[in-house]
Structure formats: C-alpha cells, structure tokens
Amino acid sequence: MSELADRISWRQLREFADVDLTRSFVLSWHVDADTLVIDVDLCLESQHPFYEKPPPAEKECIRPAYIEFPYCEHLRQDGGERGEAAEIARNIGYGAITNLCLRDDGQYAISGEFGTVIIKAEGPILRLKGS
C-alpha cells in the first residue's frame, strides 16, 4: 500500500464531523500538563450543531476552539529532532491548516502554513470555547 493509503484523514475522525479544518487557522500551540493544546479559529459547516449563519461581511462560521492531544509523548516539526514537547510547541508557528491525519505508524501529522508537526499522543479532542 502507498503511504497515503495507510493514513486516516481527519475527515474520517468523528471528532471533526461537520467542521472544515482546511478553512481553519492555528493561533498558538502549548502544552498543559501532558496535553498538547492547539488554539484554533475553527470553520463550522452548516450541519454542525453550533453553526450560526455568518454576518454579511463574513463568508464562514468561525468559532474559537482547541484541538487537544492528551498524553502527548513527543512532538517533532518538519523532520527535526524529537524533544521536550513544551519547548517544541512554543516554537511552532501559526497559520492555515491544510491537513491532519493519523499515520500508519500511529502518530498524528498536522500540516499547514506552520509546516508539518508530528504528534505522538492519544487521539485528538475538539473543544469549542465557551460551550
């Protein structure tokens, strides 16, 4: 099987039902205890239970949210060395998300304007702020 065939796309993960990560934006990264927390502006699709029609000046329903990876053992960015998760998280940039997948080696990969970040952790949890 090819490398792509061995991956599970974010679209197949129930945590991301009715959202569009490719129209979402990473604002910051940090580690809280052993959980990687990615602060995002999340694009909700019209089927999402918290979707609200955007005002005329906006095209999308964007809500502040967190993507959390509990029990984060390590992070690696763009082929760099593994290291202390909190230190690596502090140095990751921000920007639009292009992809998130579960790789065939059991690690997650999130890509975007900030590069590609490899995450060894439990499965992601999506939390809307204020809900």
Language-model regions: role of each:
Residues 1-131:
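Surface-exposed, interaction-prone regions used to assemble/regulate multi-protein complexes
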